[in-house]
Structures are given as structure tokens and as C-alpha cells.
């Protein structure tokens, strides 16, 4: 068994879509990034890579590479899952937390879980996604950005 942790953060800006866990969330702002800036999927990909000491998404998908400009983070996650499978591992379970003051994530959590489960090739009962606020504190609390953490347990295939 291997355990990995991932973290990501992006700034909220106008004139961008807000995509979280592969779900397009209606909101007045979106996350700024080289790709679609899906912080949840980025944290999950980092957790998967970290569990096998394979670096992070910046190593595999550098923001200096035009090929990843506007990239769909679901495709990036699917690629990372392929990498862990070539190393003989699969997702045992995954627990992730989105930290955002607004918008409310609860209406979208189940769709996020289903998207992540599909990308990881596992049943949805192995994937947990939850959201919290920081009670108005810090950059997420003031609405400047959104962050996410993920912890994953990989098991031999």
C-alpha cells in the first residue's frame, strides 16, 4: 500500500469558468490557471503521483508548455491514473476536501465523486469529496481563491 497527499490552490477571477471535479459550476468567477484550473482534480493528481514518489503535476504537465494551455484536468487525471496503473497500483480509496467560502459546493459533490471515480476506474464508494469554508478567514475566506486537499491510498493491482 502507498499513501499520497495533494494540495492545490488557484485565484478566483472574472471571465473564467469555475470547474471543480470536472463539473462546470455556475458562478460569477472562475479559477485562474494555465489549464482549466480545476483545483480538486489537481490535488487528486498530486496525491496519486506523490504516493508513488513520481513528482507532481507541475513536473508532468508544466505550465510553461503550450500543449497544456486550457487543458481539461479530467484528461490530466486520467493520464496520471494510467501512470499509476503501469506501476502496478490502483486507487484503494480517496478523500478530498475543497476549501471555498462561495459558491456552495454541496449541490455538485455527487457529480464530482462520480467523475473522479470514473477517471480512477473505481466504484464511487471509494471516492469521498467534501467542502468546507474558512469562516471568512484567509484568502479562501475572503473569496480570493479556492484550494483543495486530497489523500489517497493506493493498493497493488
UniProtKB/Swiss-Prot annotation:
Residues marked Transition state stabilizer (site): 34, 133
Binding positions (a divalent metal cation): 8, 10, 42
Pfam family, one: YgbB
Domain of life: Bacteria
Residues that, per the record, bind 4-CDP-2-C-methyl-D-erythritol 2-phosphate: 8-10, 34-35, 56-58, 61-65, 100-106, 132-135, 139
InterPro entries, sorted: MECDP_synthase, MECDP_synthase_CS, MECDP_synthase_sf
EC number: 4.6.1.12
An example Gene Ontology biological process: isopentenyl diphosphate biosynthetic process, methylerythritol 4-phosphate pathway
Cofactor requirements of the protein: a divalent metal cation
Record NCBIfam families: ispF
Function: Involved in the biosynthesis of isopentenyl diphosphate (IPP) and dimethylallyl diphosphate (DMAPP), two major building blocks of isoprenoid compounds. Catalyzes the conversion of 4-diphosphocytidyl-2-C-methyl-D-erythritol 2-phosphate (CDP-ME2P) to 2-C-methyl-D-erythritol 2,4-cyclodiphosphate (ME-CPP) with a corresponding release of cytidine 5-monophosphate (CMP).
Name of the protein described by the UniProt record: 2-C-methyl-D-erythritol 2,4-cyclodiphosphate synthase
Organism for this UniProt entry: Trichlorobacter lovleyi (strain ATCC BAA-1151 / DSM 17278 / SZ)
